[in-house]
Amino acid sequence: MFMNDQVYDLLRQAVIASRTLVDMSNKTIKNILRNTADHLLENQNTILEANAEDLSRIDPSDQKYDRLKLTKERLQTMADDMRSVAVLSSPIGKVLHEITRPNGMLIRKVSVPFGVIGIIYEARPNVTFDVFSLCFKSGNACVLKGGSDASLSNHALVNIIHQVLQKYRININTCILLPPNREVTAALLGAVGLVDLIIPRGSSSLINFVRNNTRVPVIETGAGICHTYFDKKGDKDKGRAIINNAKTRRVSVCNALDCLVLHRERLNDLPYICGDLQKNNVIIYADEPSYKVLVTCYPANLIQLAVEESFGTEFLDYKMSIRTVNNIREAIDHITRYSSKHSECIVSESPKTINFFLQKIDAACVYANVSTAFTDGSQFGMGAEIGISTQKLHARGPMALEELTTYKYLIEGSGQIRS
């Protein structure tokens, strides 16, 4: 068993490593990240073998399976995202505000790294690479606590990172992978003074556990209970494409659609709007008005009457609910009640209705005529993301380089003293 003292010894090494990153040039960081991306692809067979062994312990019907699975295409995406991060400008040392006081004192507010960032995540080995690239680029050491389901995949990926760091004679404790034991999680959450920030990424139960048990500051990457409101002035072709994409592109991700909110005047368009959902065997939990329409045309084994639990659920599966409303205000009320404040969408051709929706919906990402599948750091031009924050303090939405920095004030003078 890994003891607390062993965890704290590793964290102290991460603190030491984080101090060495301050002096590293952006050019060196860029070269290391590019080399790591190349090294990943050169060793993809090794990674896929480790991943296959992890997958062999999971039922393919389990929601975790798709999140855990790595393919050559996904490894290519991971490498591309790392290269995208590499070429971004450094978020460190930026002058955020500058003022010269009447007494001649110069005050500058300058961006700096947090120091050591702990990431707790589940069966998502791609997170390992995303986290390292973003933390390294922003001058932070990262401490990774992955789930046991992905332990072999994570270990293989961190080995790739360490091999490149050693090539450049960089302290490998810049990126530490902790054992996947629960006792280690408790030690990490109590590491005040060693870890500057914890970011949990995973299920609502994981996030709630971290929130309720940590002594270290946390930025939550919350569950995604996502809605799309199809307005009475919505384009049915756009709506069909957006709804299907948001639901079926990848059902296991946090930006996937969970509930279609439908204006009552568009009930007759529902069979057309749901046409692609039927092709993808999406199970629909429909309220009474939408059920009466769909029961005549949607496969009987894929349609059920909704109950209260059908709403406010993050399905992470080929399942969704439908709620019928009389107007935009009812739509907003429903979304406000059940939303996790992640990503919400309206499909409408009315500028007035769109603006009202964008202003009134309280979520990290609010879309008009765009699939919620775009809530992603790479799609926002950030290179990659460390998670989607659903809280409001410090960071909200896709968290990338800027969100992994804090700031300090630099004050210069010529001998000023305060009266």
Curated annotation (Swiss-Prot):
The record, for Gene3D superfamilies, names: Aldehyde Dehydrogenase, Chain A, domain 1, Aldehyde Dehydrogenase, Chain A, domain 2
Principal subcellular localisation of the protein: cytoplasm
Q: Which GO terms describe its molecular function?
A: glutamate-5-semialdehyde dehydrogenase activity; NADP binding
- Gene Ontology CC terms: cytoplasm
- Answer whether the UniProt record assigns the keyword Oxidoreductase to this protein: yes
Q: Which CDD domains does this one have? A: ALDH_F18-19_ProA-GPR
Its pathway is:
Amino-acid biosynthesis; L-proline biosynthesis; L-glutamate 5-semialdehyde from L-glutamate: step 2/2
Where does the UniProt annotation locate this protein? Cytoplasm
Q: Mind listing the UniProt keywords for this protein, alphabetically? A: Amino-acid biosynthesis, Cytoplasm, NADP, Oxidoreductase, Proline biosynthesis
Q: Give the GO biological process terms.
A: L-proline biosynthetic process
Recorded catalytic reaction(s): these are:
L-glutamate 5-semialdehyde + phosphate + NADP(+) = L-glutamyl 5-phosphate + NADPH + H(+)
Q: What is its EC number?
A: 1.2.1.41
What sort of enzyme, by top EC class, is this?
oxidoreductase
Among InterPro entries, the record links this protein to: Ald_DH/histidinol_DH, Ald_DH_C, Ald_DH_N, G-glutamylP_reductase_CS, Glu-5-SA_DH, GPR_dom
Q: Which SUPFAM superfamilies match?
A: ALDH-like
Q: What does this protein do?
A: Catalyzes the NADPH-dependent reduction of L-glutamate 5-phosphate into L-glutamate 5-semialdehyde and phosphate. The product spontaneously undergoes cyclization to form 1-pyrroline-5-carboxylate.
Family the entry assigns: Belongs to the gamma-glutamyl phosphate reductase family.
| PANTHER family per record | DELTA-1-PYRROLINE-5-CARBOXYLATE SYNTHASE, GLUTAMATE SEMIALDEHYDE DEHYDROGENASE
- Which protein, by its recorded name, is this? Gamma-glutamyl phosphate reductase
Underlying gene:
proA
